Design a protein with these regions (language model features):
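Alpha4 helix (beta4-alpha4-beta5 surface) of REC/receiver domains from two-component response regulators
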Residues: 62, 69, 80-97, 102, ...
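Short hydrophobic/Thr-rich beta-strand motif most characteristic of the beta2 strand and flanking loop
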Residues: 26-33
């Protein structure tokens, strides 16, 4: 059971993401619907995050920076395709909206595997 931050300004997508994470047995942190709330929630103990690129008038890159600095793996969600993501984040996991459950599950599994790899490296002497 992992603690996963959900950040999306679209209530239907946020609710779907929460439901799917719960169905997969994970603990949902949030959801946050704006950048300020997301930055506050990002201070929690997290295993991963699902982050919408565009949050109303704000972009989520300050949150992506904060998560990266803490070593928290995250996936960016967007309806704009790869060109809608800043170049420095194009190699991160992505979920193109609308996304299906099978794709979502695969991305969550990949994020959690990255987190376990990070923890193993940090624990090594």
């Amino acid at each position: 059971m992992a603690r996963i931050l959900v950040v999306d300004d679209e209530p239907l997508i946020s609710a779907m993401t929460e439901d799917w994470l719960s169905e997969l047995g994970h603990i949902v942190v949030g959801p946050a619907h704006n950048l300020a709330a997301a930055l506050k929630l990002a201070e929690a103990d997290l295993d991963a995050a699902i982050v919408d690129v565009a949050l109303g008038k704000d972009m989520s890159y300050p949150l992506a920076d904060a998560l990266s600095a803490r070593g928290v793996p995250f996936a960016l969600t967007t309806g704009y395709g790869p060109e809608g993501i800043e170049p420095r984040y194009r190699t991160h996991s992505k979920l193109g909206k609308p996304f299906e459950f099978a794709t979502f599950r695969r991305v969550v599994d990949e994020l959690l595997a990255k987190g376990r790899t990070r923890e193993a490296c940090n624990a090594a002497p």
